[in-house]
């Protein structure tokens, strides 16, 4: 067959094959390129026939070979773009999103139940004219114990198993150190001190359903002239009604705390049975919610406050206990495990 005719047929047949290739023929395109333009391809084989041509015809056919090579090389490059574009389009179509479909419902986050409880309690006290004061979680032994009428040899220190960092530095066991620091700075000539100190505290307890090595407290303090036990009871009565319902009553039972004298445990009438007796109040009609008392004169004197002129009351409650009572939670560990099945309930 005439070499020029073979070149023309190779060009035409290759162009026709290229037109048939789409995005699914990436490998076939590469194979055809090697078959036609490769070192052992069809065009190379035809090129070998140049040696058999006459001197006059060889340049003419050689030029035609180069033209065919250029045409086919360009054709392969263009078809490669077409194949790749078709491949991308097919992928886009397979992964396309139907914009008419309803969107997925977004799950919104919300405040943790302990945060909700803390903010609600803080709002109650802010409405009563108290200030909210924060403090250090890593505290000095002096402020945590000695300023609370607990010297180093006091037996009541055994009531609070403590995380010590050094002999004088510890993780606070209550937020009372905030009260001591605030009393040091308060100017009583401008009026009484009314404050609460919410925050996280730490004790060396074994974690179980009712105990945790860390928990949250809100402690309150009022110091001024002529502050009495009646003021304490009235304040606690109002707090209990706002937290547990307007019909709640409270009772005070004698107790002991080193930093208050006298000291009391405070119970609230059961909000589930109304005081008749149920499983929540253990058939007593009352639920213990906090400890309180009149500030010990020694605590006032250590802040440079004249205990003959000024008196005060203090109280402390656990946020976890309040939340557990209000929402019927029976395991304190649920607050800290990060299980959304628990937190989403609130």
From Swiss-Prot:
GO terms for biological process: phenylalanyl-tRNA aminoacylation. Mg(2+) binds at residue 261. Its cofactor is Mg(2+). It comes from the Bacteria. CDD domains: PheRS_alpha_core. GO terms for molecular function: ATP binding; catalytic activity, acting on a protein; magnesium ion binding; phenylalanine-tRNA ligase activity; transferase activity; tRNA binding. InterPro entries: aa-tRNA-synth_II, aa-tRNA-synth_II/BPL/LPL, Phe-tRNA-synth_IIc_asu, Phe-tRNA_ligase_II_N, Phe_tRNA_ligase_alpha1_bac, Phenylalanyl-tRNA_Synthase, tRNA-bd_arm. Tetramer of two alpha and two beta subunits. Belongs to the class-II aminoacyl-tRNA synthetase family. Phe-tRNA synthetase alpha subunit type 1 subfamily. This is Phenylalanine--tRNA ligase alpha subunit.
């Amino acid at each position: 067959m005439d070499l020029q005719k073979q070149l023309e047929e190779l060009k035409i047949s290759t162009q026709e094959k290229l037109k048939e290739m789409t995005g699914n023929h990436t490998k076939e395109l590469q194979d055809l390129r090697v078959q036609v333009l490769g070192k052992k391809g069809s065009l190379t084989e035809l090129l070998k026939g140049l040696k058999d041509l006459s001197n006059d015809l060889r340049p003419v056919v050689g030029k035609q070979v180069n033209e065919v090579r250029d045409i086919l090389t360009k054709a392969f490059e263009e078809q490669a773009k077409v194949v790749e574009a078709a491949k991308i389009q097919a992928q886009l179509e397979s992964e396309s999103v139907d914009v008419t479909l309803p969107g997925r419902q977004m799950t919104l986050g919300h405040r943790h139940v302990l945060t909700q409880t803390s903010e609600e309690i803080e709002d109650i006290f802010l409405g009563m004219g108290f200030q909210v004061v924060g403090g250090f979680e890593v505290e000095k032994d002096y402020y945590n114990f000695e300023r609370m009428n607990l010297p180093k040899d006091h037996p009541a220190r055994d009531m609070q198993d403590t995380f010590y960092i050094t002999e004088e530095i510890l993780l606070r066991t209550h937020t009372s150190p905030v009260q001591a620091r605030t009393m040091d700075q308060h100017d009583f000539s401008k009026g009484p001190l009314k404050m609460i100190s919410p925050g996280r505290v730490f004790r060396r307890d074994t974690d179980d359903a009712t105990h945790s090595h860390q928990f949250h407290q809100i402690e309150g303090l009022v110091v001024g002239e002529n502050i009495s036990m009646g003021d304490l009871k009235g304040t606690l009565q109002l707090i209990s009604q706002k937290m547990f319902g307007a019909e709640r009553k409270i009772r005070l039972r004698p107790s002991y705390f080193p930093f208050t004298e006298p000291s009391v445990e405070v119970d609230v009438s059961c909000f589930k049975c109304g005081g008749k007796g149920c499983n929540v109040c253990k058939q007593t009609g009352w639920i213990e919610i906090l400890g309180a008392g009149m500030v010990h004169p020694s605590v006032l004197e250590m802040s440079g406050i004249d205990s003959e002129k000024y008196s005060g009351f203090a109280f402390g409650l656990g946020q976890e206990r309040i939340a557990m009572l209000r929402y019927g939670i029976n395991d304190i560990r649920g607050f800290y495990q990060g299980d959304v099945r628990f937190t989403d309930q609130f």
